[in-house]
């Protein structure tokens, strides 16, 4: 038996509207949103009385999806440091291929993003950077060079 596909990546955020604006500015489309709760959600999460609002964002090619989750109950648990560096254990980043790193960074900065380091070129293949997005997550951007 083998996996069929990567369905989505989930990011817990504290400001759903800001996260939607950020990923829309990146170029993703809102696929849907809904409140989610019930015994099955409690069992999946291993928590009691879970109430969340979820939003699904889709990449332009339709192959990638990002779930933005805002917990109403139980309260969010903040990790330290909230702006963990790229070498922190756990999920490091989510990377998107973009047409122009510079244009994308400018759009994302207008939505609160900050560069983690700087834009750098890898050989004659890519221009790359990390930006810090909603809830402190690191979003990697890659521009393929011809």
What are these regions (language model features)?
Residues 38-43, 75-81:
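A short, acidic/glycine-rich surface segment
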């Amino acid at each position: 038996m083998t996996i069929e596909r990567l369905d989505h990546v989930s990011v817990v955020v504290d400001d759903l509207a800001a996260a939607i604006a950020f990923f829309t500015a990146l170029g993703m489309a809102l696929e849907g949103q809904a409140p989610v709760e019930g015994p099955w959600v409690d069992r999946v999460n291993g928590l009691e009385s879970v109430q969340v609002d979820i939003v699904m964002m889709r990449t332009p090619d339709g192959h990638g999806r990002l779930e933005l989750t805002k917990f109403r109950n139980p309260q969010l648990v903040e990790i330290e440091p909230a702006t963990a560096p790229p070498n922190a254990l756990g999920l490091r980043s989510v990377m998107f291929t973009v047409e122009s790193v510079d244009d994308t960074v400018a759009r994302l900065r207008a939505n609160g993003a900050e560069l983690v380091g700087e834009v750098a070129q890898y050989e004659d293949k890519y221009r790359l950077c990390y930006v810090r997005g909603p809830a402190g997550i690191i979003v990697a951007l890659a521009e393929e060079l011809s």
